[in-house]
Amino acid sequence: MTYKKTDFVPFSADAQRSIANLEAAYEQLVDIEREQGAMPTSMFWQTKNGKDYLAVKKSTSDSGTTQGPRSPETERQFAEYSAERTRLQVRRASLSALVQDRVKLCRALRLPQLAEQQGRLLRELDLHGLLGYDVLVVGTNAFAAYEMVCGARFPVGNEATEDFDLAWCRGTKVSLAAIASPAPRQAASDRASLMSVLKRIDCTYAINRRKPYQAVNDAGYEVELLAAPSTHPLPNGEAFEPMATLVEQEWLLRGTPVRCVVTTNKPASCPLYVPDPRWMAVHKLWLSLKPERNPAKKGKDARQGHVLLDATRYFLQDSCPMGLDFVLELPPALRDLFTAWAEKSGFDPTNPTA
């Protein structure tokens, strides 16, 4: 199957501006939320033996730690905390309203979106520093990001899905920790585990005993963690046990990942961090031929692989070139698939911009 450039529907200039404005507002909002999360949960005066003492709770489960009796120093500390807390609350409310306004505009322009269930999960992963640093989004949910970065609606590929696939990327070249990007606010060993983030959203999430790489909640919603052999073993604190034999996951840790912000059907917004579209495309083509693959998924895999290669050809040649350097980087199994697509599509890797 081959898709012509006319099969894609480019976003308007207004849509492109709206996407950029939404992303800027979301990033500011999540920065404020992280600042709030880093502050003590509360700070208050408590009386003991007729004297006032300043107490601080670092978290909701904290019983409180005394900072000392009332004095000019503790009063200054309390005043600074109160002022900063108020500042962040006001700023968060303002940015939340701004994000909502920009979400409404993006939805009116019918830009790509995810279901709110996926959106909430992605916001929490981002807030706690896992998205991009420890995990990236793979599978069908990634296609909203590919449409956004291409600036065009795909004829196929971005299809509804009832599950959520993540791939482990900590310690790899595609992790934000290895890319020219702000350093993570927490060391890897101090970040929350994937399961702890899921439980913040829904305490009923539990590991599926038959599939230890999968967590399921009481509503039956599934979150799967995939991991390339090179990333094993996972840290001790991770409850997930992904299979160690999925060599094809190595391919999704190549190239240049994509990050963007999309809307959800709540309406709300959420970030996406997904594999390089070139590698995702050939990965999908390979999956469509994998003997062990569920036959019901193979048709979608083939559609997604072909449409993503065509989209990359038409819209991303500057950032994701598919010239000879890329072809030579492909392992033989993927190179044959890419060559077959190129011949059928009339694409010449020696002259990719023709």
Give residue spans per PLM region.
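Compositionally biased terminal segments of proteins
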Residues: 1-52, 59-61, 66-354
